[in-house]
């Protein structure tokens, strides 16, 4: 009987459909002990910087994340202990004062652009997914999301994409594809891939329930 919780890593470029794929997996197991943890929650606290300095941070670089803290909390969850996950304020560009209590689960989905870039994170994962989506689709989705959800201007989004997001994708994110167990072209619309992933998860959950 399997007792250790499983961790599923889901990565891909910004706007590529990582969150949609993760939520599709979550929705497929409504009665299971399953949760999603986002790498974005672990952006470093920048309260000591001015707002102008925070805006200039390269948020697509590994150094923008407190991955050490994420690994520490994932290890606690694997031991069956609850953790308080930080909440990031995208408009203020720093951590908020709030945290989210995450209880231990049988399945933990770890989602983010760089979750396969760090070897220590990869070593915690049982299944690693790379959501592979066309560049044009990703930038359109990013524009819509950042304007509607994060209160950003079109000019700032385009400038960030051309100077930071695109170069970082080719330097860090795309190369991490080689570590993926499964590559999911076109994200959540790839029903066959999602079904295969869900079948694998269901078999693991069955082992836990025995």
UniProtKB/Swiss-Prot annotation:
One Gene Ontology molecular-function label: uridine kinase activity
Main location: cytoplasm
Catalytic activity: uridine + ATP = UMP + ADP + H(+); cytidine + ATP = CMP + ADP + H(+)
Any single Gene Ontology cellular-component annotation: cytoplasm
Keywords: ATP-binding, Cytoplasm, Kinase, Nucleotide-binding, Transferase
Pfam annotation, one family: PRK
Family affiliation: Belongs to the uridine kinase family.
Protein's name according to its UniProt entry: Uridine kinase
Source organism of this protein record: Streptococcus uberis (strain ATCC BAA-854 / 0140J)
């Amino acid at each position: 009987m399997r007792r250790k919780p499983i961790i599923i890593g889901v990565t891909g470029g910004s706007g590529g459909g990582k969150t949609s794929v993760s939520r599709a997996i979550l929705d497929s197991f409504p009665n299971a002990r399953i949760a999603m943890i986002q790498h974005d929650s672990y952006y470093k606290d920048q309260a000591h910087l001015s707002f102008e300095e925070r805006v200039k941070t390269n948020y697509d670089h590994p150094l923008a994340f407190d991955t050490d803290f994420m690994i520490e909390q994932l290890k606690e969850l694997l031991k069956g202990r609850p953790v308080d996950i930080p909440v990031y304020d995208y408009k203020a560009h720093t951590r908020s004062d709030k945290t989210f209590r995450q209880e231990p689960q049988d399945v933990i989905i770890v989602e983010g652009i760089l979750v396969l870039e760090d070897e220590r994170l990869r070593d915690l994962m049982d299944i690693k997914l790379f959501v592979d989506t066309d560049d044009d689709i990703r930038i359109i989705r990013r524009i819509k999301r950042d304007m509607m959800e994060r209160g950003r201007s079109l000019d700032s989004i385009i400038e960030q994409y051309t100077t930071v997001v695109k170069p970082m994708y080719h330097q860090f994110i795309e190369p991490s594809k080689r570590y993926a167990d499964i590559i999911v072209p076109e994200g959540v619309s790839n029903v066959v891939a999602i079904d295969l992933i869900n079948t694998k998860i269901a078999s693991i959950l069955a082992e836990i329930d025995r």
